[in-house]
Amino acid sequence: KLEALSGRPCLVRRYCDTSLEELRGLGIRALLISGNAAEFSEYGDHAFDELHRIVRAAEWPIIGFCGGHQQIAAAYGAEIGPMRSLRPGEPDITDVSAPGYLKEWGFTPVSVVQDDPILAGLGPAPVFLEVHYCEAKQLPFGFRLLASTPDCRVQLMRREDRPVYGAQFHPEGYTEWPFDTRNELVNLVYPAGHARAEPAGKRLLENFFRVAGILV
C-alpha cells in the first residue's frame, strides 16, 4: 500500500538493524516507523538507542504508527506505558493481547484539536484503526498535539519545527470498500470483515507524502 500511495519503492529495515549513516547512504526521501508485535520489554536495554538518534536528527520527514509513534515520543523524553488497568467489572474487549488492560481496538473516531496539512480534507473527527493498550503519557517537549480520543490524549502529534509526526492509530489499516480484506491488521481486528469503508488513513498517508514532497 505504501509503495502504491507514494509511487516510490519502500525499503524495510528492522528497528534495531539500521543506522543514521545507512539511511543517509540510501538517499531516502521519508521515514515511516511501523508498529511492533513484540512487547518493548522483549528488546534489549539499548535496542532503540539508534532509532532514537535517527528520530532526533530529523533529517527527513518522519511518521510513526502505534509503537513507532511511541518510540518517537520516547526519543524526545516522554514516558510510555499502558493506558490503565481495567476497573472491577469492566469488560475486556479482546483477548488477543494485553489481558486486564484497557485497549483501543477497532475503527475509532479521533477528535482533531489543531489543524495541520497532514489532516487536510479529513474533517473534525476522522476514523482510524486503533490496536493498542500502551500510549505516550505526555506530549513530548517541542511537539504540538493534533488529535485525541477520550481514552488516549496523544493520538496524533507533530514536532513544532520539523515534519516529524506520531500517530497512535494505524493509518495504513484503512479500507476502501465494505469487507475489504487486503490489510492483515484489519483482518486481525475484524475476522468476519468490516462492513464499512474507512478510507481516512489513506488520505492521511497521502497528505504525509505531500508534506514530504513525494506527492504533488
Per-segment meaning from a language model:
Residues G67:
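Conserved H-loop
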Residues A47-H52, E79-P82, L146-S148, N183-L185:
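Glycine-rich, phosphate-binding/catalytic loops in enzymes
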Residues L2-G64, Y76:
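Flexible gly/pro-rich beta->alpha loop and the following alpha-helix that scaffold active-site loops
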Residues Q71-I72:
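Local cysteine-cluster metal-coordination motifs and their immediate loop/turn environment
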Residues E172-V216:
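Acyltransferase
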Residues G7, P140-L146, R210-G213:
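A SAM-dependent methyltransferase catalytic signature shared across enzymes that methylate proteins
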Residues G77-Y165, F169-Y174:
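Pocket-forming structural segment of enzyme catalytic cores
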Residues E50, R144, R203-N207:
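Alpha-helical elements of Rossmann-like donor-binding domains used by nucleotide-donor carbohydrate transfer enzymes
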